């Protein structure tokens, strides 16, 4: 057996301690932290959407759709026309997701070529859920949808909300 000097011994024993400590704390099975719970207006809209979806499982708020949502809000506010360029930008923003639905809360105005916001934000969750029932949004009723991104914004003195839904991340 080879004799070790002090430096080799300390190096080897230090490596062994690190290996044992990692094994003891389950270093190989790291679970990422749960996503932060939504707060504020987006939380109320999410609650209304999940009421509308009952008895389907609740949707999970996903911040990865933020870049696409910024484009949707610009379109809803009339700051960006819904054209080939907008469609391309949205396509690039949702590339990491499977089956992203059409934006919820805006409709196309055939006269102007712009999208218009339709869902007014309310502190009353029941009213927002009722508005969804009146609109019968097919995207939200799909059991395959699991993720949502919600944005509220001011337009002409009124607070509106829009949402994007997706089946999953790729």
Ranges and model annotations:
Residues 1-23:
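N-terminal secretory signal peptides and thylakoid transit peptides that target proteins
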């Amino acid at each position: 057996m080879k004799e070790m000097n002090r430096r080799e011994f300390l190096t080897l024993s230090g490596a062994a301690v690190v290996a044992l400590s990692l094994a003891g704390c389950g270093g190989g099975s790291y679970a990422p932290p749960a996503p932060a719970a939504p707060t504020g207006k987006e939380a109320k809209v999410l609650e209304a959407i999940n009421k509308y979806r009952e008895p389907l499982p609740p949707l999970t708020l996903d911040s990865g759709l933020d870049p696409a949502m910024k484009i949707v809000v610009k379109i809803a506010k009339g700051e960006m026309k819904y054209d080939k360029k907008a469609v391309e930008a949205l396509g690039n923003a949702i590339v990491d997701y499977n089956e992203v639905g059409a934006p919820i809360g805006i409709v196309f105005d055939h006269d102007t070529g712009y999208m218009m916001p339709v869902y007014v934000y309310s502190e009353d969750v029941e009213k927002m859920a009722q508005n969804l029932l009146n609109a019968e949004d097919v995207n939200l009723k799909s059991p395959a949808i699991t993720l949502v991104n919600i944005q509220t914004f001011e337009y002409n003195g009124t607070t509106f909300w829009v949402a994007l839904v997706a089946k999953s991340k790729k």
